[in-house]
A protein has these predicted regions:
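Amide-donor transfer/coupling interface in amidating biosynthetic enzymes
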Residues: 10-142
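Single conserved hydrophobic/aromatic residue that forms the stacking wall/gate
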Residues: 1-8
């Protein structure tokens, strides 16, 4: 049995691309993304691979991030079900193609809401805070 029953392939455009686009975080119980459920956030993609090939129906996967559009260029990889991120059933292991670490600060974003320009960090930081808290809760148990 594999950790993730999927394969990643070269993107449909068959070339390296770097662009800023939107993701939706569906309801999920993953360690890093659970608290972001329902959010729509901007993010960078920068790679030539990463097209999720998902041969089973979508509900067979623990999808934690989806591109806002199903077609190119909004789904730059051509991923099935416009999936941008997926995680293991227990929520601990994440596979994601966009680069959330490149969208942590508002100045890194190609667009950021005017009414939030005073933010020191974007909501993406929450994924890293969640991971740290998860580790701390388990590392210091007696």
């Amino acid at each position: 049995m594999t950790l993730f029953p999927y394969t990643t392939l070269f993107r449909s455009s068959k070339k390296f691309e770097s662009t800023f686009l939107g993701l939706t975080i569906p309801q999920n119980d993953s360690v890093m993304f659970g608290s972001l459920s329902g959010d729509k956030l901007g993010i960078w993609v920068a790679h030539g691979e990463g097209r999720f090939y998902l041969p089973e129906p979508e509900d067979h996967y623990n999808v934690i991030a989806k591109y806002n559009y199903a077609e190119y260029p909004g789904n730059p990889n051509g991923s099935d079900y416009n999936v941008a991120g997926i995680c293991s059933a227990d929520g601990r292991h994440l596979a994601m193609m966009p680069h959330l670490e490149r969208a942590i600060f508002p100045w890194q974003n190609a667009w950021y809401p005017a009414d939030r320009r005073n933010d020191e960090v974007t909501p993406w930081i929450e994924a890293f805070v969640n991971a740290r808290q998860w580790i701390e809760e388990r590392a210091f148990k007696k």
